[in-house]
């Protein structure tokens, strides 16, 4: 192993000489120093992907085409997308790897990039309502992306109930974006005016050949012992602090403490979705009424909707549900990578019958969970995953399906709240009326609920597997009911009162 490797992005002479000694010799391209390597967390979503677990981040947009300059045609839409993508290199980058690479893959420019490889067109069946749109989008969500091309697709869905509308589904691999980065990527295709000129083209970072990828990978691999020497003490300290917190009752929900539900089980290859939309003014009224945060209200809405759904099916657990919640650390982490998030576990107390007590319990629990997550730090998870590779995570994916979840799943669902723009946006010239985010399913948690705000509305996207939950509209329709309940319920219960169903 060569010595003298100090970083993970540039290849040192020792690495180049080491590889040259193996008979690997290729010219160095001028742009290879800018080659971007996936972080461990980025690559995690590649390594954990299986045919029954596609790890894509999606969003469904409802567009008013009457604002498109010149009028909407698919050809104009295609041409507009082509112009905007030229200004966003992320849309033109694909994975590159080699068997000699000891680190994670890299992003390089796709020299054969063509919009037609990524843009699809499909007609919505009659009558063109939300159920027909959801059926198409659920099918698309379950399709894998082609890893030989940039990891995204856009589907234009025409033929809705109104002639001046189309729906668009954008699907991007989780290795490319997390929730916040996905919103930023989407913004590259938006403007504040329908006739805004397309941005100027931006050059990509170039490519990388076998030697370049292997050399910089060898450098990163050689630096792992140094990084491990830092991570292990930090982990030990975190474990000690967590034990002390547990003695005082100041920890987030523990993994594998979740009750069994109908949406916890082995995942199939298919996906189904449902969605709904709420008025952000009402959400903020609930926030102000109870003196809580928007995140607390989102969890309370989820708890109320799931309570209604589980009660209707006679399977409401006596214990609180447990959600894993991604927490953005884009403004707190100095680690490289597209995905800048950690996770926390929060309780979703659907067993509490009184909505006022339910949201107060949620607010108190979330305060503890956020404090615990902050104590763990924004980079510990990222640092540990950095050491994992395809072999380790592949073995995990072979083992996990055989772990019994009859009594206590690791968690019941994934719950995410992504902040969105509070302005009227135009997507390639079309007015964006609604946006519904859709997250992936992971492990044996067959339910993902993601919300995102847009111009005074809160879009709620729900994803599951039809093998577990054949019909999600009962969950989606529970959100407006849960919001109404929080707006109208009495709040005269004494502090600490906890009404539960027996």
From Swiss-Prot:
Example of a GO biological process term: response to nitric oxide
Pathway participation: Glycerolipid metabolism; triacylglycerol biosynthesis
Enzyme class, spelled out: transferase
GO molecular function, a single term: diacylglycerol O-acyltransferase activity
Catalyses which reaction(s): an acyl-CoA + a 1,2-diacyl-sn-glycerol = a triacyl-sn-glycerol + CoA; di-(9Z)-octadecenoylglycerol + (9Z)-octadecenoyl-CoA = 1,2,3-tri-(9Z-octadecenoyl)-glycerol + CoA
EC number: 2.3.1.20
Keyword Lipid biosynthesis: yes
Pfam families the record matches: WS_DGAT_C, WS_DGAT_cat
Family according to the record: Belongs to the long-chain O-acyltransferase family.
Function: Catalyzes the terminal and only committed step in triacylglycerol synthesis by using diacylglycerol and fatty acyl CoA as substrates. Required for storage lipid synthesis. Upon expression in E.coli functions weakly as a triacylglycerol synthase, making triacylglycerol (TG) from diolein and long-chain fatty acyl-CoA. Has very weak wax synthase activity, incorporating palmityl alcohol into wax esters in the presence of palmitoyl-CoA.
Name listed for the protein in its UniProt record: Putative diacyglycerol O-acyltransferase Rv1760
């Amino acid at each position: 192993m060569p010595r003298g490797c100090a970083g993970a992005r540039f290849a040192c002479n020792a690495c180049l000489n080491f590889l040259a000694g193996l008979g690997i010799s290729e010219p160095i391209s001028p742009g290879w120093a800018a080659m971007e390597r996936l972080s461990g967390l980025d690559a995690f979503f590649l390594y954990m992907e299986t045919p029954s677990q596609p790890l894509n981040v999606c969003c469904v947009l409802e567009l008013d085409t009457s604002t498109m300059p010149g009028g909407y045609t698919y050809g104009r839409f295609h041409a507009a997308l082509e112009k905007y993508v030229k200004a966003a290199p992320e849309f033109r980058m694909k994975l590159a790897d080699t068997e000699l690479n000891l680190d994670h893959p890299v992003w390089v420019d796709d020299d054969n990039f063509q919009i037609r490889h990524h843009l699809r067109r499909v007609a919505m069946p009659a009558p063109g309502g939300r159920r027909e749109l959801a059926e198409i989008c659920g099918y698309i969500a379950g399709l894998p992306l082609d890893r030989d091309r940039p990891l995204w697709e856009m589907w234009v869905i025409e033929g809705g109930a109104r002639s001046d509308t189309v729906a668009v589904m954008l699907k991007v691999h989780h290795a490319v974006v997390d929730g916040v980065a996905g919103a930023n990527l989407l913004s590259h295709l938006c403007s504040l005016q329908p006739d805004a000129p397309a941005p100027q083209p931006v050059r990509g970072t170039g490519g990388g050949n076998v030697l370049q990828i292997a050399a910089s990978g060898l450098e990163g691999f050689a630096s792992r012992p140094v990084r491990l020497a830092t991570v292990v003490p930090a982990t030990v300290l975190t474990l000690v602090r967590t034990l002390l917190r547990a003695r005082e009752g100041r920890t987030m929900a523990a993994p594998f403490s979740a009750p069994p539900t109908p949406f916890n089980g082995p995942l199939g290859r298919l996906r189904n979705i449902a969605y709904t939309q709420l008025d952000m003014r009402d959400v903020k009224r609930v926030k102000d009424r109870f003196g809580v945060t928007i995140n607390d209200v989102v969890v309370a809405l989820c708890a109320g909707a799931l309570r209604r759904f589980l009660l209707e099916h006679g399977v409401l657990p006596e214990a609180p549900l447990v959600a894993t919640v991604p927490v953005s650390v884009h403004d707190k982490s100095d680690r490289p990578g597209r995905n800048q998030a950690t996770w926390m576990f929060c309780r979703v107390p659907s067993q509490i019958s009184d909505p006022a007590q339910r949201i107060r319990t949620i607010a108190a629990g979330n305060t503890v969970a956020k404090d615990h997550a902050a104590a763990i730090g924004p980079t510990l998870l990222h640092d540990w995953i950095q050491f994992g590779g395809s072999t380790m995570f592949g073995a995990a994916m072979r083992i996990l399906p055989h772990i019994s979840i009859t009594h206590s799943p690791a968690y019941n669902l994934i719950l995410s709240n992504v902040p969105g723009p509070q302005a009227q946006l135009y997507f390639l010239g079309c007015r964006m009326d609604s946006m519904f985010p859709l997250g992936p399913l992971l492990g044996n948690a067959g339910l993902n609920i993601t919300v995102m705000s847009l111009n005074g509305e809160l879009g709620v996207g729900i994803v599951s597997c039809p093998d577990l939950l054949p019909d999600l509209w009962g969950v989606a329709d529970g959100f407006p009911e849960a919001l109404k309940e929080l707006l109208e319920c009495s709040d005269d219960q004494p502090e600490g009162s906890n009404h539960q169903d027996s």
